[in-house]
């Protein structure tokens, strides 16, 4: 829907580990040739420094496992003050962040992959990543396949995986 309605640019906003995850997909997108107006910013910098490219037509993408990250909550408020739309991920529903974002995704243990699906979906919709559907299909198998990868990696990992992952 956001892509259909149009947008000026995309801001990946986070703090701590969330910013780290956002940064990984930001750089991956660039390596894939992404020409979308994509910005990566620390939530505190977003709040206090601002960005001349940020407008009511921007899309802000945030995540917070707890749903209570204060800087991210404040970034959502700032986005809404100018009329920008916010896409968010949390693992705990009925939290401030879950209640504030315009589009919410919630699950457990999927934040890293979620960042990839969001940014790559924007790229797909812009005609810049035609392998999106294949990637998402492959990612659905990761939880079960990763255990076998651990087992195949070395004997110590196999012992651990046999004991705790099956």
Region locations from a protein language model:
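Internal, active-site/partner-interface "lid" segment
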Residues: 124-162
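Glycine-rich phosphate-binding loops that contact phosphosugars or nucleotide phosphates
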Residues: 3-139
């Amino acid at each position: 829907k956001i892509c259909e309605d149009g947008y000026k640019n995309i801001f990946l906003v986070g703090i701590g580990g969330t910013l780290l995850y956002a940064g990984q997909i930001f750089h991956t997108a660039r390596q894939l040739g992404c020409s979308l107006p994509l910005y990566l910013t620390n939530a505190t910098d977003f709040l206090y420094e601002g960005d001349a490219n940020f407008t009511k037509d921007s899309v802000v993408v945030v995540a917070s496992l707890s749903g209570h990250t204060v800087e991210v909550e404040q970034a959502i408020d700032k986005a809404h003050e100018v009329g920008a739309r916010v896409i968010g991920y949390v693992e705990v529903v009925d939290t401030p962040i879950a209640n504030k974002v315009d589009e919410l995704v919630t699950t457990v243990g999927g934040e890293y992959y979620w960042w990839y699906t969001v940014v790559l979906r924007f790229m797909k919709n812009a005609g810049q990543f035609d392998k999106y559907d294949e990637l998402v299909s492959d990612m659905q198998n990761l939880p079960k396949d990763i255990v076998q990868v651990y087992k195949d990696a070395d004997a110590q990992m196999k012992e651990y995986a046999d004991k705790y992952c099956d």
